[in-house]
From Swiss-Prot:
Transmembrane portions of the chain: 28-48, 98-118, 127-147, 248-268, 303-323, 343-363
GO CC, one annotated term: chloroplast thylakoid membrane
Organism for this UniProt entry: Calycanthus floridus var. glaucus
Protein name: NAD(P)H-quinone oxidoreductase subunit 1, chloroplastic
Keyword Transcription regulation listed: no
PANTHER family with a match to the protein in the record: NADH DEHYDROGENASE SUBUNIT 1, NADH-UBIQUINONE OXIDOREDUCTASE CHAIN 1
InterPro entries for the chain: NADH_UbQ_OxRdtase_su1/FPO, NADH_UbQ_OxRdtase_su1_CS
Gene: ndhA
Length: 363
């Protein structure tokens, strides 16, 4: 059987085109997955660098300066060092719980990014229950911390895990009515709809002015959820050595710090989305001159502007928890629980009742 050379070339060309098509399909499948991961990683590195520089300025000392320009790669160098350190395991601990705990803490926080809109319809999952899905997912992280403390077979670690669980429960409850109040004002639980509801009146339409009490309660509760000073009781050095992190080393030890900064960035982004207008500018788009083109919500330029506005608001807000860490002393455990249960919870419930009454009257 004689095969024409032209037919062989056509078959080879078809095979190459099919192979290229499969490669392109694989790339288009991986790009949406790795792009958010890369962006989140860079965001965490920037937060670590900002905190080190600000703390150095407050303490009148020189911050990181050798790893990269202005020391911006210091966090990456520290992470690489932890990656190659020995992973020690407690001899009498529960190895499975000890190993799974850090992963649960990080993964549960990473899932929260799926409902955060960085721009107009630029969100991984635009769900009708977006904000409440975030609350449900964030409740999983303390389970990982409790597993880490219990699996370490160490009294300091276990005490730190119990404190983390108690603190999360105490401040998750007052945080939920604040989110519910925002949902009532916006007539939706979707994060995209909440931002759109704030865009009607520009700067004065932000929920920051319509819900000042809820904003303060949300701010305090989110700081406690992130276990930042003055709420870092689960890992208080003077009392618990390092809390649930005491027995950890290597990359597992680093995962706890990754989870902490991821949670801080999530909280800042949700403050931006719920109270600071999301990707909207402080003034309505109609007042911006047409040559700037910012009033165009579609296209690459409009999407880039939306992302930059969201990130700018979030990183400006990050100065609050960073400065708070180096300003206020640590609270006692009884003060922490009293603040959550006896002060913030009644205020948030009263605020929710007030908003519900206004909404019923306006019907």
């Amino acid at each position: 059987m004689i095969i024409d050379t032209t037919e062989v070339q056509a078959i080879n060309s078809f095979s190459r085109s099919e192979s290229l098509k499969e490669v392109y399909d694989l790339l288009w499948l991986l790009v949406p997955i790795f792009t958010p991961v890369l962006g989140i990683t860079i965001g965490v590195l920037v937060i670590v660098w900002l905190e080190r520089e600000i703390s150095a300025g407050i303490q009148q000392r020189i911050g990181p300066e050798y790893a990269g320009p202005l020391g911006i790669l210091q966090a990456l160098a520290d992470g690489t060092k932890l990656l190659f350190k020995e992973d020690l395991l407690p001899s009498r601990g529960d190895i499975r719980l000890f190993s799974i705990g850090p992963s649960i803490a990080v993964i549960s926080i990473l899932l929260s990014y799926s409902v955060i809109p960085f721009g107009y319809r630029l969100v991984l999952a635009d769900l009708g229950i977006g904000v409440f899905l975030w609350i449900a997912i964030s409740s999983i992280a303390p389970i990982g911390l409790l597993m880490s403390g219990y699996g370490s077979n160490n009294k300091y670690s276990f005490s730190g895990g119990l404190r983390a669980a108690a603190q999360s429960i105490s401040y998750e409850i007052p945080l939920t009515p604040c989110v519910l109040s925002i949902s009532l004002l916006s007539n939706s639980s979707s994060t995209v709809d909440i931002v759109e509801a704030q865009s009607k009146y520009g700067f004065w339409g932000w929920n920051l002015w319509r819900q000042p009490i809820g904003f303060i309660v949300f701010l305090i509760s989110s700081l406690a959820e992130c276990e930042r000073l003055p709420f870092d009781l689960p890992e208080a050095e003077e009392e618990l050595v390092a809390g649930y992190q005491t027995e950890y080393s290597g990359i597992k030890f680093g995962l706890f710090y990754v989870a902490s900064y991821l949670n801080l960035l999530v909280s800042s982004l949700f403050v931006t989305v719920l109270y600071l207008g999301g990707w909207n500018l402080p003034i309505p788009y109609i007042f911006i001159p047409e040559p700037f083109g910012i009033n165009k919500t579609d296209g690459v330029f409009g999407t880039t502007i939306d992302i930059l506005i969201t990130l700018a608001k979030s990183y400006l807000f990050l100065f609050v928890p960073i400065i708070t860490r180096w300003t206020l002393p640590r609270m006692r455990m009884d003060q922490l629980l009293n603040l959550g249960w006896k002060f913030l919870l009644p205020i948030s419930l009263g605020n929710l009742l007030l908003i519900t009454s206004f909404q019923l009257v306006s019907l």
